[in-house]
């Protein structure tokens, strides 16, 4: 069964879209994003789980376009903060502002020693077809939160997230290095192993 020619990544985040495009480059798929469909209504991410938010995004996009879509919801879970910011990661400081989110995270971890600043990045990906056939996969990356930002690459909480594998923050890695270990990369690799079977279903 051939794979679809066009897939919509349900995001307006250009950084996230680039990560998906890089991971999907080996496949013969045309990638589009919400930027290509300005008439799609705003998607409210008000679910209480990553899967609920991702499913909501994918459903809105599929219904509006008639094309298959992949949506993700990702977040940072910090053990010392009882799993926060979690599903609220993108709007932790009140709106979608990386600098403000990072500042709030550092403030809330004030006084917590480095050894106890363990954290996990989580991604849930939902692939949805117009037929309603749904595939859900997850990916995670364990690490810890630094005391101060490091690096100029990446986005979101990347400057604060320490990779033990590379002994660098995610923002100090090249895009290729980040894709090797990232939670989104792990979820996407898992998705692609199941992609053909998912697409072959009615």
From Swiss-Prot:
It is an enzyme of class 3 (hydrolase). Its cofactor is Mg(2+). Substrate binds at residues 11-16, 74, 155-158, 178, 183-184. Keywords: Hydrolase, Magnesium, Metal-binding, Nucleotide metabolism, Nucleotide-binding. Mg(2+) binds at residue 73. GO terms for biological process: nucleotide metabolic process; purine nucleoside triphosphate catabolic process. It catalyses: XTP + H2O = XMP + diphosphate + H(+); dITP + H2O = dIMP + diphosphate + H(+); ITP + H2O = IMP + diphosphate + H(+). GO terms for cellular component: cytosol. InterPro entries: dITP/XTP_pyrophosphatase, ITPase-like_fam, RdgB/HAM1. Pfam families: Ham1p_like (PF01725). The active site is at residue 73. Its EC number is 3.6.1.66. Binds 1 Mg(2+) ion per subunit. GO terms for molecular function: dITP diphosphatase activity; ITP diphosphatase activity; metal ion binding; nucleotide binding; ribonucleoside triphosphate phosphatase activity; XTP diphosphatase activity. CDD domains: HAM1. Pyrophosphatase that catalyzes the hydrolysis of nucleoside triphosphates to their monophosphate derivatives, with a high preference for the non-canonical purine nucleotides XTP (xanthosine triphosphate), dITP (deoxyinosine triphosphate) and ITP. Seems to function as a house-cleaning enzyme that removes non-canonical purine nucleotides from the nucleotide pool, thus preventing their incorporation into DNA/RNA and avoiding chromosomal lesions. PANTHER family: INOSINE TRIPHOSPHATE PYROPHOSPHATASE (PTHR11067:SF9), INOSINE TRIPHOSPHATE PYROPHOSPHATASE/HAM1 PROTEIN (PTHR11067). Homodimer. Belongs to the HAM1 NTPase family. This is dITP/XTP pyrophosphatase. It comes from Lactiplantibacillus plantarum (strain ATCC BAA-793 / NCIMB 8826 / WCFS1) (Lactobacillus plantarum).
């Amino acid at each position: 069964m051939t794979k679809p020619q066009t897939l919509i990544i349900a995001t307006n985040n250009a950084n996230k879209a680039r990560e998906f495009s890089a991971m999907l480059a080996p496949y013969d798929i045309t990638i589009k994003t919400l930027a290509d469909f300005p008439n799609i209504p705003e998607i409210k991410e008000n679910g209480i789980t990553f899967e609920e938010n991702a499913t909501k995004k994918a459903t809105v996009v599929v219904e509006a376009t008639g094309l298959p879509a992949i949506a993700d919801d990702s977040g940072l879970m910090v053990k010392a903060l009882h799993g926060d910011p979690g599903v609220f990661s993108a709007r932790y400081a009140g709106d979608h502002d990386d600098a403000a989110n990072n500042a709030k995270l550092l403030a809330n971890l004030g006084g917590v020693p480095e050894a106890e600043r363990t954290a996990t990045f989580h991604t849930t990906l939902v692939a949805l077809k117009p037929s309603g056939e749904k595939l859900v996969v997850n990916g995670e990356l364990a690490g810890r939160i630094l005391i101060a930002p490091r690096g100029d690459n990446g986005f979101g909480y990347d400057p604060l997230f320490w990779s033990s594998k590379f002994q660098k923050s995610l923002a100090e890695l090249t895009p290729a290095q980040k894709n090797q270990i990232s939670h989104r990369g792990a979820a996407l690799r898992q998705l692609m192993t199941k992609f053909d079977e998912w697409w072959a279903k009615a």
